[in-house]
């Protein structure tokens, strides 16, 4: 094995799938012409002159630049980064023109419009008054956008362009929320409901109040006092978009237009005791801010963080190793539980057919187990000692967790009374609130909430599958969850079993209490990778800086109504979402309706989360979003956010699947693509020429058909037979994932490793855009650029890494170069490679640079501060013509190949068509 950098020879193939990946002809994108607008006075000739003046390369004679070529891999060359390369989910600096800015589209209004060095669809043309210009619309043909330019999946939404005087602080860079926190499906809002209906586009907002598991990984400003100014009528919070009146003594609400008094303490600094400039206050400068709440926002003192651990101790849990793994993980995570003010409390209940309470003797190291056999009417066997302070009882808790598995090591009880255990845990903490964290390896089979195995074989693949297998089998779990919500109690589930667990029913516990259901099929402690994944995710789950006893309310300008809410919470009233605890790794979607004609050039939305921090402080996190309006369909389409729209349609498809059937959910998604293409063809294609391609769409929406097509092939919706627990878990994940994770789940990321640039897998300098000297900042591992999810972009001798958001697949092609196998695995024999769930051997940089770089890439992908998911690695060896017969007949390897291949969503899989075939079928549907 050599430490030198090896250049792996690439065999030349005269024919093969890889030939399909050739780039398009240079004139392929000449159809990208701006949509003609009769009222527009900003002509193409004028645009051409400005482009030439700016000396932007690649501008054609018509003034419209060709489509960017970086989305396609050139023959013999590794795929390169887009010209504007940045992390799409990190906050970006905004332009100084009142516009959402470079972080939201790559170019300010004065720079290159669609198809140039920025995003292939955003130029500013339409004047909405007061100096603001909306995005111009450029058309592309989906049938010629093959392979699809997937780099655009990592681009920011279209820029939000506002009048120069839209903010109280002129040219504020931080007044409008970034999409990491608050984004709309439409960055230009229709002025009336008929226009919205005509567009066939949804109007909804995506709220992600927290985008990191730990507070220190966020940069949200906090007010330095408890002065909060709110509108007397609509109760909106003062924000960067209000206007001042009467020499700054009053402010006009940007939601309902009411004049309100500014508090006398608004320009007084309590810390220094000095008068301060009110314009320096964070709530007037920042779109996302946290207020420290005064006492009137508290119904009681902020609650401490409370965890009740409900642990399966039945024979299945003992034999699989779940009980021992969980208690050891909790023990190792005690220091990670947020406990800054030493008020955290914990309790433990072991569950088989009985309830095993753990009582701590105050001040003593010993504990005792109190067994309650009456599961019909569960009760607390002791008035005290069950729920104890973590800090004060640390030694006893540590000893309990060390000894806990031995208490049940010979247990042969096959019962699992989850329902009674939940009721007991709720009774224990209902007067305080907190979390019930359940670890189960067994289907609840005794007591209230008893479940039985459903007959999957008789309904799998049929229209009634969803109602028979995905509907809750027992109403107890939803009704109990609603009770928990009113008591400020969240339920989280960690389900580990190779047998049926009825995830569809149990997940109601988490859905209505703002929790989450984590599913680990075929988990066993005999597999190191299984233990590592469960332990890592449980530990990160316990370490989250969760918010407590929280509510979320979203407000909008006059004329808007919040009509539907999606996510894991419970609607306490028509517009108030209740969260006993607020997780930091989930997202929420609110659909809006337009109730009256909007006559203002800008409308506003505000989301507020009233909560208690895990260190005992009552706060309100407020997020603000301002959007321009338009009465023109062209403006609506030019500023549509395709990723947010995909998120919306995902929620609607989940709703359709659970209320109707899986086939209807798939048909719904395809019908939405057809609707949008029909509207675009009839209303927005220049001249509406008969015989024009039916697959024309705006460049900023050209990934939407791909995403919705791939969604129909997702585990949650696909027509093939899928175990109901797996399907239910997939539906849960889709319904709560933030947009970055959602998109990766729908369209997995594939990296080509055998031909990656020399810089990949090694530390590089991540540019700091705020550093004027360009010295750079954070040292980070460089990742390869993704390639399309299709075998057409693969080589028969390649090495590929697939990231589907939940797992990683390392695909070693059957004709791989032996030297690559040697450098990566330490053997030249391809069939000596350990396949399946495993880890790569660890070689130092000197021993094998290639092995080191690949492991660094995998480590970087796994490294995330916004999710608890730990991605297991599966090594897959592809088929080859000289493969030994005994290898070809291995069922596990065949299943693994099929699983990994299902991530190549652009290809034909089973009965599902390829993306190319899908587009062909769309032509007839759109032309009808």
Swiss-Prot record:
Component of the coat protein complex II (COPII) which promotes the formation of transport vesicles from the endoplasmic reticulum (ER). The coat has two main functions, the physical deformation of the endoplasmic reticulum membrane into vesicles and the selection of cargo molecules. Residues 231-256 are annotated as: Zinc finger-like. Residues 27-48, 69-86 have a biased composition (Low complexity). One of its GO terms (cellular component) is endoplasmic reticulum exit site. InterPro entries: ADF-H/Gelsolin-like_dom_sf (IPR029006), Gelsolin-like_dom (IPR007123), Gelsolin-like_dom_sf (IPR036180), Sec23/24_helical_dom (IPR006900), Sec23/24_helical_dom_sf (IPR036175), Sec23/24_trunk_dom (IPR006896), Sec23_24_beta_S (IPR012990), SEC23_SEC24_subfamily (IPR050550). This is Protein transport protein SEC24. The COPII coat is composed of at least 5 proteins: the SEC23/24 complex, the SEC13/31 complex, and the protein SAR1. Golgi apparatus membrane; Peripheral membrane protein; Cytoplasmic side. Belongs to the SEC23/SEC24 family. SEC24 subfamily. It is found in: Cytoplasm; Cytoplasmic vesicle, COPII-coated vesicle membrane; Endoplasmic reticulum membrane; Golgi apparatus membrane. Keywords: Cytoplasm, Cytoplasmic vesicle, Endoplasmic reticulum, ER-Golgi transport, Golgi apparatus, Membrane, Metal-binding, Protein transport, Transport, Zinc. Residues 1-104 are annotated as: Disordered. GO terms for molecular function: SNARE binding; zinc ion binding. GO terms for biological process: COPII-coated vesicle cargo loading; intracellular protein transport. It comes from the Eukaryota. Signal peptide: none annotated. Zn(2+) binds at residues 231, 234, 253, 256. It is a peripheral membrane protein.
